[in-house]
């Protein structure tokens, strides 16, 4: 639905609508190759060696749910499922096993999606071998033209899609179903949600599938998009072989419009739901549509629109941080809808009782921007950031991934807009940006937002003691805000700088492991530093400054205090600089600085961006670590947001199931459960501030720096900005006594009923897995995870149609002793929750008894090694390993031993490791189901029970 003004390979494009002007056309990246077969099938190719030796495909079919008739509502999405359930060259049950046999994983490497006006099929090949490319193109062409649509397979898939529909049910879904038909009255868009309606999913005859398929899956609607490490010339004959011969047998049909009409009057819409906890006010307006952006002039128009909405949101953000706003969040946007309309929106969210204030303040801010415009100071800050992002785009483009390129190309194909190279984009920005004035930006904003044909939409909880306002009251409040006298204001200019860092620290010991390219050093203040140079991603550096402690140190008396301490990074401020001042200081800087509670044992400061700006990032991080402050407004908003989140969890079966599982495997340790309402209410800003200062000043620290910067370049920065932090212990031994959980012996069982309107349950089953330090067991269980996931999909999803999505997950324990988690589960029908858990245990039990087959082991090994081949090249991979290298007592040899170890693992090894952990004392089962109507009326939330019987 969004359209990108100028598609860029670097992800720094502008998402804005466009219009056609008599202006030079936008350029196109010359590296993109395109063509068309005689029957109308189009292709797009981009040669790219990141990752090396891989080739990624996306087939774009220009049709979606908008083209469905009343009898076909949901069949565009249903068809996408059927592509995996039988084609001419892959009879039912053969497609997924084949691709798994060459190292691909269903979901990650083989997938599809359906929207209102498009259907996309993705296929990521692990190699560029001609035979694999040929199979990929055969598969995609089968999707396009040769689905079998076997009646038996259709009937078996109905249950899966009904469960997919169930998995999406929520308060938000119910609000959408009430709101859209009225907000977008008379449109097809409002009544053509891709998931469809249950009557059609459950009962549509095969003839309707065939009718939709043959009408819309036709050559002129198909584009094959490719990005990867090969040449296009050898691929073209294969494209012709598989795609070129097909001719549609039915006449072409005109695509059906979304039917969106420009709004022509003011109105108010109020939508409520008993399980909605937050409140939002929205100003929505639909304006006439515009063609795809294709000219330099339209690029300029869209750049103006982007600057204008960003400036407006900066103002709202400033009001929030100063405590002047009733809302906790606000945004504005200009968005294209299917080339038929332009949606203009402004929205704010906050407390239900403040809806009137939020609406008034949002309108006042809109009026201020429309009537008074923006200042040169404000615009200069946003211009700096825009230019800096464009300049960095040129530096990162050479190593952008093929998957990112593919997404950009698909969006371009769909929207009919050119793809600019990073340099082309930068050239345009440099040419246009200096001539844009604050007055012009203000007029652009006014042209979109100063219109009185808004729909004022209020979404609000429906609960005792909270009156739901009448529509007339909302409309009257909006009109009063438009009529209110507007005071003249101006943006404050804050001339701020970061305080100087006095002195410098010293590295007292540094060792380079040449085999791994890793340098590990000690600063004289006790901070450990690991560095690895990598230019796999150009102009990127990632930094983690990890302080040992935080959540693991909390007690029943201060639960949640680490989350409060994390607020220093939500809106960075110091004793001398407000969060707004620091925000302005960061304009034009291509590095992010954030942080907070990373996990129970780590409080982290996180940096990421351009090495050119690393010194600024470390300087800011040093300033926050030594003088960071939690602003009062930030704390108040956190408390309210957290309480609303807890309120929402009360009616969420998934949240109840997760909490119950955490309680079972931890023995009820309060550190492992969700914080409670009364605990949030007693936490203070002062507690969080003191906790933050203690951690930053005293906790052992381990730092990882990975990216396109050498040790020689980074060393002086480390000594200056990390070496001048307070001295601390080298070891985190003080945490050892906190790592033990007092779990009861199993089997552990929790069966809950939850007071909710959503007709869905959750079932989990599994066992306590291994600790991370047990490398052999950890890798054997990773193999088991992959194999069991495939078995679960085949049995629980495909054969029994009990769930939409299910897989196994193996998480080794690094923080708490003997607390690894191997589990599987899913949402399902309430009456099927127990059966889902039983089926999971049956598969786990069978695996323990018989182990993997030779074929399963070979497939799982290939999949893991394929992911490893891609992942080990990424800076993120090395950062994740190095940031806890000492804390977890790990060895760099783990990395080099992985491939050989996985290749040596036998079926007996995997089975033996699995049997070690899948024993009654370590098993668990959790179900959470909606309460009966009587329980709901009584307001009960049900109970948790423990049992000591062997799961079925």
Where are these regions (language model features)?
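Positively charged n-region of N-terminal signal peptides that target proteins for export
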Residues: 1-7
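Bacterial N-terminal signal peptides
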Residues: 7-19
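Proteolytic maturation boundary segments
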Residues: 21-45, 223, 231-303, 309-317, ...
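M16 family metallopeptidases and their MPP-like homologs
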Residues: 46-47, 51-78, 93-142, 173-199, ...
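Metal-associated gating/positioning segment near the N- to mid-region
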Residues: 82-90
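Flexible helix-coil linker/hinge segments at domain or subdomain boundaries
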Residues: 150, 248-253, 371-379, 631, ...
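Hydrophobic, small-residue-rich alpha-helical packing segments that form membrane-like cores
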Residues: 153-166, 171-219, 225-227, 232-239, ...
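Edge/loop elements at the starts and ends of beta-strands within beta-rich repeat scaffolds
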Residues: 355-357, 448-450, 694-697, 917
């Amino acid at each position: 639905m969004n359209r990108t003004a100028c598609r860029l390979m670097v992800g720094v494009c502008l998402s804005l609508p466009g219009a056609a002007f008599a202006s030079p056309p936008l350029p196109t990246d010359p590296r993109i190759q395109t063509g068309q077969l005689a029957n109308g099938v189009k292709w797009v190719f981009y040669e790219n060696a990141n990752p090396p030796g891989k080739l990624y495909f996306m087939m774009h079919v220009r049709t979606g749910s908008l083209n469905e008739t009343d009898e076909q509502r949901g069949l565009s999405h249903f068809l996408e499922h059927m592509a995996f359930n039988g084609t001419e060259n892959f009879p039912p049950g053969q497609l997924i096993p084949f691709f798994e046999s060459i190292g691909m994983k269903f979901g990650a490497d083989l997938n599809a999606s359906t929207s209102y006006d498009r259907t996309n099929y993705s296929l990521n090949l692990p190699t560029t071998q001609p035979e694999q490319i040929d199979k990929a193109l055969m598969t995609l062409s089968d999707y396009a033209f040769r689905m079998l649509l076997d009646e038996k397979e259709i009937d078996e898939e109905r249950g899966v899609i009904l469960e997919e529909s169930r998995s999406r049910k929520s308060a938000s879904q119910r609000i959408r179903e009430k709101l859209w038909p009225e907000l977008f009255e008379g449109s097809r868009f409002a009544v053509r949600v891709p998931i469809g309606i249950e009557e059609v999913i459950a009962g549509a005859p095969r003839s309707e599938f065939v009718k939709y398929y043959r009408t819309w899956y036709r050559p002129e609607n198909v584009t094959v998009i490719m990005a990867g490490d090969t040449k296009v010339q050898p691929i073209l004959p294969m494209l012709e072989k598989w795609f070129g011969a097909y001719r549609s047998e039915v006449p072409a049909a005109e695509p059906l419009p979304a039917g969106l009409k420009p709004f022509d009057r003011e109105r108010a819409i109020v939508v409520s739901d008993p399980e909605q906890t937050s409140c939002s006010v929205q100003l929505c307006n639909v304006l006439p549509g515009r063609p795809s952006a294709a000219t330099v002039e339209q690029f300029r128009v869209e750049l103006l629109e982007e600057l204008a909405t960003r400036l407006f949101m900066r103002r709202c953000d400033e009001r929030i941080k100063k405590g002047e706003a009733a809302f906790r969040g606000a945004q504005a946007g200009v968005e294209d809808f299917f080339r038929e309309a332009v949606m203009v929106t402004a929205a704010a969210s906050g407390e239900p009782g403040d809806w009137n204030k939020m609406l008034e303040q949002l309108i006042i801010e809109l009026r201020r921007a429309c009537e008074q415009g923006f200042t040169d100071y404000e615009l200069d800050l946003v211009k700096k950031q825009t230019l800096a992002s464009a300049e960095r785009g040129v530096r990162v483009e050479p190593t952008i991934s093929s998957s990112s390129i593919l997404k950009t190309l698909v969006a371009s194909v769909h929207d009919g807009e050119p793809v600019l190279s990073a340099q082309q984009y930068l050239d345009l920005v440099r040419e246009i940006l200096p001539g844009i004035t604050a007055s012009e930006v203000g007029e652009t904003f006014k042209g979109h937002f100063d219109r009185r044909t808004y729909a004022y939409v209020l979404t609000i909880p429906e609960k005792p003691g909270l009156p739901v306002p009448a529509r007339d009251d909302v409309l009257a409040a909006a009109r009063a805000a438009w009529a209110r006298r507007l005071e003249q204001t101006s943006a404050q200019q804050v001339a701020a700088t970061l305080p100087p860092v006095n002195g410098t620290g010293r590295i007292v010991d540094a060792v380079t492991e040449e085999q791994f390219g890793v340098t590990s050093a000690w600063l004289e203040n006790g901070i450990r530093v690991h560095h690895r140079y990598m230019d796999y991603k150009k102009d990127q550096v990632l930094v983690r400054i990890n302080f040992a402690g935080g959540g693991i140190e909390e007690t029943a008396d201060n639960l949640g205090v680490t989350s409060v301490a994390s607020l220093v990074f939500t809106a960075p401020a110091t004793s001398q600089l407000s969060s707004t001042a620091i925000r302005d200081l960061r304009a034009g800087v291509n590095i992010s600085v954030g942080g907070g509670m990373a996990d129970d044992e780590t409080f982290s400061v996180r940096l990421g961006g351009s090495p050119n700006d690393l010194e600024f990032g470390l300087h800011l991080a040093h300033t926050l670590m030594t003088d960071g402050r939690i602003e009062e407004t930030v704390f108040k908003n956190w408390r309210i947001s957290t309480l609303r989140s807890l309120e929402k969890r009360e009616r969420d079966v998934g949240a109840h199931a997760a909490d119950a599982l955490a309680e079972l495997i931890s023995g009820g340790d309060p550190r492992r459960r969700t914080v409670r309402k009364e605990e949030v209410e007693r936490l203070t800003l002062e507690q969080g501030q003191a906790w933050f200062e203690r951690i930053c000043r005293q906790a052992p620290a381990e730092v990882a720096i990975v990216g396109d910067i050498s040790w020689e370049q980074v060393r002086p920065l480390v000594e200056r900005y990390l070496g001048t932090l307070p001295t601390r212990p080298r070891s985190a031994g003080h945490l050892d006594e906190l790592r033990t959980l007092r779990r009861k012996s199993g089997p552990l069982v929790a069966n809950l009923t939850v007071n909710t309107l959503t007709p869905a349950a959750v079932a989990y089953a599994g066992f306590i897995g291994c600790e991370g330090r047990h490398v052999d067991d950890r890798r054997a269980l990773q193999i088991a995870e992959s194999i069991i996931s495939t078995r679960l999909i085949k049995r629980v999803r495909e054969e029994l149609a009990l769930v939409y999505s299910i897989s196994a997950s193996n998480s080794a324990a690094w923080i708490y002793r003997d607390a690894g988690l191997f589990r599987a589960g899913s949402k399902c029908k309430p009456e099927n929750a127990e059966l889902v858990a039983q089926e999971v245990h049956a598969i786990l039990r069978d695996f323990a008894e018989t182990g993997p087959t030779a074929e399963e082991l070979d497939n799982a090994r290939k999949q893991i090694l394929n992911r490893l081949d891609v992942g080990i090249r990424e800076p993120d991979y090395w950062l994740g390993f190095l940031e806890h290298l000492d804390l977890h007592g790990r060895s760099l040899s783990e990395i080099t031993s992985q491939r050989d170890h996985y290749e040596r693992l036998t079926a007996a090894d995997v089975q033996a490791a699995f049997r070690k952990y899948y024993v009654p004392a370590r098993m668990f089962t959790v179900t959470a189901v909606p309460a009966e109507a009587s329980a709901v009326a009584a307001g009960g939330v049900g109970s948790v029970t423990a049992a000591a019987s062997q799961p079925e």
